[in-house]
From Swiss-Prot:
Glycans are attached at residue 103. Probable lyase that catalyzes an essential reaction in C-terminal alpha-amidation of peptides. Mediates the dismutation of the unstable peptidyl(2-hydroxyglycine) intermediate to glyoxylate and the corresponding desglycine peptide amide. C-terminal amidation of peptides such as neuropeptides is essential for full biological activity. GO terms for biological process: peptide metabolic process. Its EC number is 4.3.2.5. It catalyses: a [peptide]-C-terminal (2S)-2-hydroxyglycine = a [peptide]-C-terminal amide + glyoxylate. Its main location: secreted. Coiled coil: none annotated. Its cofactor is Zn(2+). One of its GO terms (molecular function) is metal ion binding. This is Probable peptidyl-alpha-hydroxyglycine alpha-amidating lyase pgal-1. InterPro entries: 6-blade_b-propeller_TolB-like (IPR011042), NHL_repeat (IPR001258), PHM/PAL (IPR000720). NHL repeats lie at residues 46-90, 113-154, 162-206, 212-256. Pfam families: NHL.
Amino acid sequence: MRASTACLVALLAPFYISALPVEYFYGDEQQPIEEGAENSAVFEQDRELIGLFNPSKEIGQVSGLAVNKNGHIVAFHRSGRVWDEKSFNDHETFNKDLGVINNKTIAIISREKKVIDEFGAGLFYMPHGLTIDNNGDYWVTDVGSHQVHKIDAKTQKIVMSLGEKMVPGEDQAHFCKPTDVAVAKNGHIFVADGYCNSRILKFDAKGNLMAQINAATEENQPSEFVVPHSLSLIEDMNIVCVADRENQRVQCFSAGLSEGDRTLPTGIPITSATDIGRVFAIREREHYLIGVTGNSEDVEAQMFSIDMQTGKTETFAKGVRNTHALAIAADGVMFVSQLEPSRILEIRLL
């Protein structure tokens, strides 16, 4: 068993998800983080060690996180920009007076917390999602410009954009505050669109629309997405999972990537986890789907793990609030960004 697998296996307890419809249950209760503990350099809960991953150089609010092929942490951040009531008008158009962010917005950070490279100045308006494809190139979403961009990792230049700059819309050529992007090895692009349209769109490698994924119909569950905030693509299982934030659930669908006579078309419901809190980010590693949630009326902020092969689930890191982005390193260490206070947490399982 590889180290990263062993690290994640330690989470699992006998709880299950199954084919639709299904209810989600959470496992052993843990004490919330004590008042003031969140400001400590390191604090320990029952099953995890949580420390502050403070980069050597100050960066802004981190809206997107990823781990590159070298094992470095990549942070997509907003520099000094803050998303508030002045950022957009009633038609979802970004406030042109704010202009582009002139500072660098992408930081590459070593595991020793040293900022080893920065770029992205003069490109983005309100950074949001980040992923790294199989070739090591970066994909980001900018809710300010209503676009998705591919950035060449070597040149650090935008080489492809989807959506019309600064123009929100709901047709095939426009997005409205897209939140996240996932890219398959064959070049197919999945976009969570997002805060306004609440839909999932699939494009080919050239940016041509292939399919739209709609929310699965489940008993006693909403029939539409409400802020699909994060995506996770599990290619060898032909699954794409959606963090349906305001519906407090994760829904997983066929990704339409397999070939042959038994290929499932894109968007067939596969499984789901419901009533788990407002899910801000999901990421997969070795068939474990890891997620972070925010506070809701019935469920406190926490993280969860789902074994996508067996359906076993568990929760952990209860009380870690205001999270937004998640990345998982090869050794199973998890990195979680918080917007308030603005920082990155490093979470190791005991």
